[in-house]
Amino acid sequence: MRVAYASFTECGRRSENQDYLRVLELDKNRFLFVLADGMGGHHDGACSSRIVCNAFCEYWLKHIENGIHEDFISEAALQAFNKLKRQADRKKGVKMGTTIVGAYMDGCRVHIFHCGDSRCYLFRNPKGCIFQTCDHVDFSLT
């Protein structure tokens, strides 16, 4: 199977782009795409997104050969966010935060994951968008 992909980020209304993207090409049929977006109102969102994205990918590379099981993606995210918490604690407890969204392609199977309000969309020609994740944010609280 041939896979082609592209990426694009934009800072939107903010002065700084706090997005961080990683793509792991594990072999010709397995790809991991991860995007983290630093949370507005928190300290150093660009650093937060970089830490979480890299820690998630590090966990993935270290453990993927054991195969994907039910809690694999959750454990990768937990390890990544724990690393971010340790960094925040070293900075005397400043609030650091980021969203994360991604997809793991294994042949014809795709696993989608996300936490926060970063979305993943699935487009299929000629139908257009056929799937969209739901945000994990209650906007009535903001």
Language-model features: locations:
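PP2C/PPM-type serine/threonine phosphatase catalytic domain
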Residues: 1-142
